[in-house]
């Protein structure tokens, strides 16, 4: 971690310590040393929004039916799918059940999802207090109301093996799909505990435990379904992107109002996003004159100065869903040296975005073709482009993120949601700021007719001062 200008590293825990001790209504100024430039004139933190599960029983039934249809395909032929406690992110469990637990506090939910719709979907969560909480949230009128899903205060390999046997999944030849066993996006070796898997195999001899994720168009029973967002999911992502834009606006306002450190920008965005979403974000990383991913999602003590270009990776989570935005902004006014270069770079990126959106033909364009079109757009403009052409959007860290190979063969379909985040470093010898990388990223929804933005902000150049 980088060192702050005062000599010490700034951690997210330190940033939150004062607020945790005093309460969410703590004045923002009190989190900074007395006399700190950004501590002057700050008001109260925003009131936090308390959210409850929003997806309808109809949405549950849609997901379950679609996942079960893929489980029945000959190449998968799965009798059930399980998620395990060692997957503490719990994205697949949340997709199937809406149940989530605070990360790192306890094991993730263990789900037994049978292919047979007559069988109950079981969710093992680690304590009675968690069962009571989720019964309250998902009970009357919710996903638990009709008895098709049930919660148990258990966790671990032995509890899961016992449940599988009780539900009739102990017969020789049974095929159980294990979520996150391998082939996952950020964890290619999986998230399943070897000890837990050994317990299942020794307790249930003759039962096959197999992966359910793979790269390419036949992505697996959960990944393939999750790629295409339903209207309900689209509304949740739209809300998440709106929160992203509020976080971006808060960081810009902090720079305008005298922030002196990157940490001040980060904190302004964090408090705004967390308060509106009511849950932790997926990604908040801010760089000054470098990539938005340069600070690995933490506040640091890098100095804020006029003439810098601030780039971010911002992805709130609402109901667990997120879609990233990126919008480099200029710290200073249009008369500050470096602004002309920044504006020229944004103009190039706007042209690339326009060409990219027009290129998408639902049901025809592949993600590989889309990325090649972006490379060609930069070449046509005689500029050095970069950045990810396709980045995931959806629940947690789900796909699609295009990578060399099979995933580029996936065809864009209505409901697919992803981040398009090109960047550019202009060849402008002699211009102030020349060579700095500028990024403009937006969350995209593929529709029946083409593609639209999830966001509503202006995509043009932004200067913090006039």
Q: Residue ranges of each PLM-predicted region?
A:
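Active-site neighborhoods and metal-handling regions in enzymes and metal-associated proteins
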Residues: 2-466
